């Protein structure tokens, strides 16, 4: 255990409190973004049943989420570069968008509203990545690899624990 201590010390050596706070906040936010963006897939069997959807409609929900995310990530990257001082607004907007999307899907009375919610999930995911990565690259110019890899761990943890936690919630409560 003590052999690893110097390596961990080297990992964070020379990084100030503000930088560590930013890295921690963006990593935790990345966890939340991936958790939120994967919730829809976990709820799809229940949405299909409640809204009496076909397999094609369920596939279209996923396509809308991914299509909107793919289309807007390039736009989001352009905006993150154009409005450099608004990085916090982009990442905050991402989390708010994802919360709004899940609310819309949760109260959705129809397939159409579920598609709207899926599109908002795609938009929220697209808002996060360019702004967060730009912020980390600027804050850690000599340690971009370290900062971006720690940020990536947040995504992996969100992807890993999301299904377990959401599955437990769905077992205890309704998907809505």
Question: Where are the regions a protein language model picked out?
Answer:
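Extracytoplasmic
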Residues: 25-55, 76
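Interfacial helix-cap and linker-helix signal at transmembrane-aqueous boundaries
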Residues: 47-48, 79-80, 168-173
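Cytoplasmic helix-loop-helix junction between adjacent transmembrane helices
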Residues: 117-154
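Residue-level signature of mid-helix packing/kink "hotspots" within the transmembrane helices
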Residues: 38, 66-74, 159-160
């Amino acid at each position: 255990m003590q052999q690893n201590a110097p390596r961990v010390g080297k990992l964070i050596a020379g990084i100030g409190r503000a930088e560590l706070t930013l890295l921690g906040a963006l990593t935790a936010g990345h966890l939340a973004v991936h958790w939120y963006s994967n919730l829809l897939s976990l709820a799809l069997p229940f949405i299909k049943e409640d809204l009496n959807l076909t397999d094609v409609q369920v596939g279209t929900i996923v396509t809308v989420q991914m299509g909107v995310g793919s289309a807007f990530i390039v736009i989001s990257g352009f905006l993150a570069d154009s409005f450099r001082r608004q990085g916090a607004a982009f990442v905050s907007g991402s989390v708010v968008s994802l919360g709004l999307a899940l609310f819309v899907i949760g109260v959705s009375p129809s397939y159409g509203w579920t598609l709207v919610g899926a599109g908002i999930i795609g938009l929220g995911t697209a808002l996060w990545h360019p702004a967060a990565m730009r912020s980390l690259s600027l804050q850690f110019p000599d340690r971009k690899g370290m900062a971006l890899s720690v940020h990536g761990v947040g995504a992996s943890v969100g992807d890993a624990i999301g299904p377990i936690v959401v599955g437990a919630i769905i077992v205890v409560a309704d998907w809505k």
